[in-house]
Regions:
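Anaerobic metallocofactor- and corrinoid-dependent redox/one-carbon enzyme cores
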Residues: 2-13, 18-19, 26-30, 43, ...
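Long, compositionally biased, glycine/small-hydrophobic-enriched stretches that function as flexible linkers
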Residues: 2-192, 196-205, 209, 229, ...
């Protein structure tokens, strides 16, 4: 009998599911606790829907509860039990009925229906992350909040294949609204990103590394470290922070440390500085750096110090600052490059920055200087086939642009591909949620050429790993974007008939070989 079951991430064991221990490091007891939490979130949503209640405190619990179960977020059984206790108290408050089945119902049933139910569930987990970040900055959307109740309740209801597909596409539209909300939260709070060059070398002296996605946490840390002789470096998907005016104004935000999340156990080894995890992706810390790791928000790992927020959302990062000063950092400047040896990265090409150059881009397309635009991005991971994305970008023709976002960009963002009429060929849009920016750019180009997105010389080549990538894909499909290339493998939770439906309806295509796919896209024989 399986000790656990989880198939929500791209690296799931054998391409079918983790049953003894998670490839991510999740242990069976943690998986069981997360399943029990998910079951109770569904019951809580059902009870509130029956009463017509959607109180803010319940909405926050539903959102954060889903976020906790996202891949590489929380491995702390004690923290998960404590959060589940809060759900139990709320279940009693809303007078929810006694459960009739064990949490394993989530993964049982007819294969295609389980596939579709899982797709919606994993999409909800991704949207929960975005809604959480927006709410932390004071931004909410009633349609998004309502859909957490609807989506969770729908998971426990019987639906035909057609009804599941309709629900999933409806979710995709709502998730796009959620990404728009987070874009609004980020740009109104921190300003519109501007193109910014970021150094990967590390200066001597005390420093702190910040990883994850939470810009509010980064701002609080920057305020608390100002004038204390402690530099701050971003890591992973915090790289786009350098483009936001209200963050880049801090002169001690000096650069970017390391590469993508899956290399952290090597990158952080013997690091003479503390690391703050604001969200995923957290891997089980190794002894060589475990005493310098801190978590906050929904992130957790047993034995790792956690920085809580007070009732006003304030966090005291004094322990990190003191440890940074005590460790002292490197004694000399350190030369560190990206995966391809480059030492400078460029970020900040979000919708406002790119659309400010729209006339130049349009003229370049009309003149033939730009013949194709690729969006190559998404999650990175340790799967051997992910070098596909490096090779694909290297092989793109000189008359093409490469838009990129999320941690998949680290496969190639230190490459110098040159420029077209002063426009860099690689344009880093931002974090995974900035897929909203990418769509806005595409819509603006489509409007300028009086055509649909699918008629543009534009191809999406996406990499996925966890559930935020799932919700983004569902939003793109809901918007009618077709012929997306997806890799390095298709999700294990998509059954063969469901894959066929997506291929037939949307032209979804698994990646094959970089040159083969590139030739097919550019219709080269």
């Amino acid at each position: 009998m399986a000790e656990m079951f989880c198939f929500q991430c791209q690296q799931t064991a054998g391409g079918s599911g983790c049953v003894r221990t998670g490839v991510c490091g999740k242990q069976p007891e943690t998986a069981q606790l997360q399943d029990a939490l998910l079951d109770k979130l569904v019951r809580l949503a059902q009870a509130c829907e029956r009463k017509g209640w959607r109180p803010d405190e319940v909405t926050e619990l539903l959102t954060d509860g889903l976020f906790i179960t996202l891949t590489n977020v929380n491995f702390d059984d004690g923290a998960i039990r404590a959060f589940t206790q809060r759900i139990d108290e709320m279940l009693a408050w809303v007078d929810a009925p006694t459960p009739e089945k064990d949490p394993g119902w989530l993964w049982r049933g007819e294969t295609d229906l389980v596939s579709l139910r899982s797709t919606l569930l994993f999409g909800l987990k991704g949207m929960a992350a975005y809604a959480h970040h927006a709410r932390e900055l004071g931004y909410t959307d009633s349609a998004v909040d309502t859909w957490f109740y609807k989506g969770l309740t729908s998971l426990a209801q019987p639906h035909s294949v057609e009804e599941w597909l309709e629900l999933i596409l409806e979710f995709g539209r709502v998730n796009f609204q959620c990404m728009a909300l987070l874009d609004q939260a980020h740009t109104e709070t921190f300003g519109h990103p501007v193109p910014t060059r970021v150094n990967t070398d590390i200066q001597k002296g005390p420093f702190i590394v910040v990883t994850g996605h939470d810009l509010k946490d980064l701002r609080q840390l920057l305020k608390q470290t100002a004038g204390k002789g402690v530099n701050v470096y971003t890591h992973g998907e915090m790289l786009p922070a350098h483009g936001y005016p209200e963050l880049k104004k801090y002169t001690h935000l000096v650069g970017h440390f390391g590469t993508a999340w899956q290399n952290q156990q090597t990158d952080f080894a013997d690091l003479p500085a503390p690391v703050l995890f604001t969200t995923n992706c957290l891997m089980p810390p190794r002894p060589s750096y475990a005493d310098r790791i801190y978590t906050t928000s929904v992130v957790g790992y047993e034995g790792i110090p956690h920085i809580p927020a007070d009732e006003n959302g304030h966090k005291d990062f004094t322990p990190l600052i003191q440890q940074a000063l005590s460790l002292g950092g490197y004694e000399t400047d350190q030369s560190r490059g990206g995966l391809n040896g480059g030492h400078m990265l460029t970020t900040g090409f979000a919708r406002n920055a790119v659309l400010s150059q729209a006339p130049a881009i349009l003229n370049a397309i009309k003149s033939g200087a730009i013949k194709h635009i690729f969006l190559v991005g998404g999650c990175d991971g340790a799967h051997p086939g992910r070098n596909y994305y490096t090779e694909f970008v290297k092989r793109t023709p000189m008359d093409s642009l490469v838009l990129t976002l999320a941690c998949g960009t680290f496969r190639f963002n230190d490459l110098d591909l040159g420029e077209i009429h002063g426009i860099p060929r690689i344009l880093d849009i931002g974090q995974c949620n900035d897929a909203y920016s990418a769509v806005q750019i595409a819509l603006a180009l489509a409007e300028a050429f009086d055509c649909s997105i699918n008629d543009l010389p534009l191809t999406l080549v996406l990499s996925w790993y966890e559930q935020k990538a799932v919700c983004i894909l569902l939003s793109l499909l809901a918007l009618g974007v077709k012929n997306i290339y997806l890799g390095p493998t298709l999700p294990a939770f998509l059954s063969e008939p469901v894959v066929k439906m997506l291929v037939d309806a949307f032209g979804l295509q698994p990646t094959t070989h970089p040159q083969q796919d590139l030739d097919a896209i550019l219709q080269r024989g």
